């Protein structure tokens, strides 16, 4: 694989790279480094800890259908030369659909990496040229058949910032009307509404094991539910 110079890459570029399966240049993710120095140097440490590593080279070592794996050679703000490996991903939209009666719509599907069926919120990768809202609308329609009159982004987070570039956008979907689902050929999805108390109980007893779903539901119940 060819050596590359430091460059910046957009999330849409990542999607193109995944589609083409080509090696591309990229920049390493920001890194912060702790410094156990004396209290007198706290101010200088605060400034240094927010500096980004210098990227010496970047290689795509794997290009699959869903994500890329990059290996970057970097110099940390401390001067340490090291290797950083990360998964490049264009981001995902996660939908929390609330029916007119207040129930929350969850889906169940088989997640191959876990070797089990999981209950979770509607979610999917943001395709090239899509906004998080457009991706949310598409995923909701495909996986459940429901259409929503209103979407509102209420939370953004990185699920695994240690090595995964993916950013998740959680959107509240309201004003739902039913329709015909349009799942992918390899998807077998069951959609089912639950009351707020039922969803809370599913979290309490461990029936909900999907992190994005737990985060989204708890945030909604704590700050948004009326």
Each language-model region and where it sits:
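Short beta-strand micro-motifs in enzyme catalytic cores
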Residues: 68-72, 117, 167-169
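Acidic, metal-coordinating catalytic segment for phosphate/diphosphate chemistry
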Residues: 53, 57-94, 100
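Conserved Nudix-box catalytic region and its N-terminal flanking loop in Nudix hydrolases
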Residues: 45-52, 84, 94-138, 155, ...
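Intrinsic, low-complexity polybasic segments
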Residues: 7, 16, 28-40
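Unchanged
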Residues: 82, 91-94, 125-211
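Short, low-complexity, intrinsically disordered N-terminal modules
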Residues: 1-3, 17-19, 27-30, 46-47
